[in-house]
């Protein structure tokens, strides 16, 4: 009975968090997560390049429209994300990993926000 309850709870958590219920909820390591999952991944690691649309050196966040435009710089990192059971992982490609429970996510934005340059019209 407890196993059934926990299974149902897990499915509900995936729906609330916007994670798919595909085969075990797994996602192989990728730098291009499914479009429907960007809201989840980009909330907890907003400096990933796949979260931004850049043109002519100015970038707009694909998910959070209230984010200011930024200048494309070292703030944006090439991330790979993966999910195995309830473990969500961000890899920044330089040996830095951020691992968290998918159902209890913890943002990992602070170290990168120090490098973010907000676009000002005078920057042109």
UniProtKB/Swiss-Prot annotation:
Upregulation details from the record are: Expressed in the early phase of the viral replicative cycle.
UniProt protein name:
Protein MGF 110-4L
Q: Where in the cell is it found?
A: Virion; Host endoplasmic reticulum-Golgi intermediate compartment
Where does it sit, as one GO cellular component term?
host cell endoplasmic reticulum-Golgi intermediate compartment
Q: InterPro entries, alphabetically?
A: ASFV_fam_110
- Signal sequence range: 1-18
Similarity section:
Belongs to the asfivirus MGF 110 family.
Q: Which residues are glycosylated?
A: 64
- Sequence motif: Prevents secretion from ER, positions: 121-124
Q: What does this protein do?
A: Causes the redistribution of lumenal ER protein to an enlarged ERGIC compartment.
Arranged from A to Z, the UniProt key words for this protein are: Early protein, Glycoprotein, Signal, Virion
């Amino acid at each position: 009975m407890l196993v059934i309850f926990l299974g149902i709870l897990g499915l509900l958590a995936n729906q609330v968090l916007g994670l798919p219920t595909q085969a075990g909820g797994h996602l192989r390591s990728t730098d291009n997560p499914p479009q429907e999952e960007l809201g989840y991944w980009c909330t907890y690691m907003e400096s990933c390049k796949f979260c931004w649309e850049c043109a002519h050196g100015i970038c707009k966040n694909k998910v959070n429209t209230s984010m200011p435009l930024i200048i494309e710089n070292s703030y944006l990192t090439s991330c790979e994300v993966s999910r195995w059971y309830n473990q969500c992982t961000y890899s920044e490609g330089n040996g830095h990993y951020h691992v968290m429970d998918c159902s209890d996510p913890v943002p990992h934005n602070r170290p990168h926000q120090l490098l973010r340059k907000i676009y000002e019209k005078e920057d042109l």
